[in-house]
């Protein structure tokens, strides 16, 4: 399979990032290698983005089919363009991956599933999306910008209680100065509201009493993004929901970009691979007594030095795979 995927990749790499280089897929060949596409396979790409992973998967088998899902309508439109030539082999769904299988009736069990978590290059590079700290961007950060029920970053920063802000930066940004930062934000908004990424970065300057590093800024923006989009809750629910629809022998490949995501994936895959899940105090096994599946590779797969050199945003990526029994 590896040679087949490598050769298919060479043929399709040019268009894998989508129109306007929407997003360069990370760990592309490695992910499809572990999925092991089959001719009659039925797959889920729960974060289709620019369509890179789905495109290579479809190129690796003549008749396999994919459900291409994304909560970002802009991403879905790009994926439709990239994957247009595959016709009815692709079904496009605008939804979150933790909800799609409840909304989209399956014809049968999934042969495999892919999740590529995190923010796409397109989302980072578009000022109006508000995900980046590098430009004077509006503080939005909603993955689905059409969903008016989602709170924006501007609303959280200007309306959330100080204690809630502290918790957000501590739990989701792992920021040791979360209390001081929350207090600074509340003090600032009493005078003028925080409306742009520059406004937030200016508060970081005052809090740290120096120029914050890009890594420090990224942690704070990450914390807000996770909160707004319920990313960790979505991941926990989505992993379990997708597992339930995997067929025997199906592979589940998940690419994470920070430790909070990776812990959840690692813990879930490990739990599903245990032969006994009874509480330690139980004298006799009272559960199913059989592992749901296995982790074919205990350590996460990192991008090669060459991939990182060509795509710096791949640096923090880690691929984990679970295979259903």
PLM feature segments, named:
Residues 1-325:
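S-adenosyl-L-methionine-dependent methyltransferase catalytic core, i.e., the SAM/SAH-binding region
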């Amino acid at each position: 399979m590896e040679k087949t995927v490598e050769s298919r990749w060479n043929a399709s790499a040019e268009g894998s990032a989508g129109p306007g280089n929407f997003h360069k897929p990370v760990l592309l060949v490695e992910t499809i290698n572990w999925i092991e596409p089959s001719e009659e396979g039925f797959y889920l790409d729960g974060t289709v983005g620019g369509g890179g992973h789905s495109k290579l998967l479809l190129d690796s088998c003549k008749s396999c089919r994919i459900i291409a899902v994304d909560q970002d309508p802009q991403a879905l439109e790009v994926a439709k363009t990239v994957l247009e030539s595959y016709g009815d082999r692709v079904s496009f769904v605008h939804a979150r991956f933790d909800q799609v299988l409840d909304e989209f009736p399956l014809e049968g069990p999934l042969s495999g599933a892919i999740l590529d978590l995190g923010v796409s290059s397109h989302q980072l590079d578009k000022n109006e999306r508000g995900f980046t700290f590098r430009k004077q961007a509006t503080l939005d950060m909603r993955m689905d910008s059409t969903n008016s029920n989602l709170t924006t970053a501007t609303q959280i920063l200007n309306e959330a209680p100080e204690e809630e802000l502290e918790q957000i930066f501590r739990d989701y940004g792992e920021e040791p100065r979360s209390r001081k930062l929350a207090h600074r934000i509340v003090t600032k908004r009493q005078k003028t509201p925080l409306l742009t990424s520059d406004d937030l970065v200016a508060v970081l300057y005052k809090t740290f009493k120096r120029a914050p590093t890009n890594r420090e800024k990224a942690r704070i923006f990450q914390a807000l993004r996770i909160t707004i989009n319920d990313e960790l809750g979505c991941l926990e629910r989505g992993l379990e929901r997708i597992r339930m629809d995997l067929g025997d022998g199906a592979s589940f490949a998940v690419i994470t970009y920070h430790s909070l995501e990776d812990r959840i994936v690692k813990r879930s895959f490990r739990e599903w691979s245990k032969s006994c899940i009874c509480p330690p105090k139980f004298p006799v096994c009272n559960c199913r007594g059989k592992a749901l599946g296995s982790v074919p590779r205990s350590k996460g797969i990192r991008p090669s030095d060459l991939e990182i050199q060509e795509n710096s945003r791949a640096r923090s990526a880690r691929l984990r795979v679970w295979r259903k029994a």
